[in-house]
Amino acid sequence: MEVQLLDGERIDDLERNGYRIIQNPNGFCFGMDAVLLSGFVPPKTGGRILDLGTGTGIIPILLRAKTKSRDITGLEIQERSVEMAGRSVRLNDLEGDIKIVKGDIKEASEIFEKASFDAVTSNPPYMKTDGGIKNPSETKAIARHEVLCTFEDVASQTSKLLKEGGKFYLVHRPERLSEIMSTLKAHRLEPKRLKMVHSFVDSEAVLFLLEASLGGRSGMKIEKPLIIYKEKGVYTDEIYEIYGF
């Protein structure tokens, strides 16, 4: 289905199932972290999936392409992003499989039935409100800083929304790993699988991907790290595979 583009918008090919997404370079375009998170979710994942802070809907659309789930919901608080994500869903004729809902992450368990999701994903703001320089663009500031919600909010709501044994998948920065693991465990979300992401094989980690299970037993698998570049400007085969090239 063709949809109307607003001023400054463009349509990008996602290289998956012919899916496309509407973006506005003057707003907040999705980055590699969202793609890596989608690739970290096992393809066999089915049932109901919720993406907290979905932005323009990139993660739900990629999960529809990569997993067995046909019941995916994206929750987003910013009206412009909600509207844009909805048009991307219609653009791909996925209205029957993906729903975009406007709402606050802090109120997610009031918007949706508790213990009703098999999996939750989130690419949350990485920086605390007092960390780093805030972007003058409100849209970008909300996406990058914990302006409207904290990771504590994300973990708390996730624990209420997941079914017992349900999975939580997130991407975040290594400098907050210890804090995030403590927060997860405080909400009965047991870390089960961790993958560090490095720009180069000999560089420090720049991101981590983590899977947690609600009510799971202790015991975490540390996976082989993901390396982004073979050399400057040249992606590794694993990155090409995740992107579908």
Task: Give the location of each predicted region.
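Class I SAM-dependent transferase core
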Residues: 2-44
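General small-molecule cofactor/ligand-binding pocket signal
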Residues: 22, 99-101, 192-195
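Short glycine/threonine-rich catalytic loop with a Thr-x-Gly-x-Asp
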Residues: 28-30, 55-56, 202
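Residue-level signal for inorganic ion chemistry
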Residues: 37, 123, 154, 212
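Conserved SAM/SAH cofactor-binding pocket of Class I
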Residues: 40-133
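Mobile active-site "lid"/loop adjacent to the S-adenosyl-L-methionine
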Residues: 124-153
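Conserved Class I SAM-dependent methyltransferase catalytic core
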Residues: 148-199, 203-205
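SAM/dcSAM-binding transferase cores
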Residues: 204-245
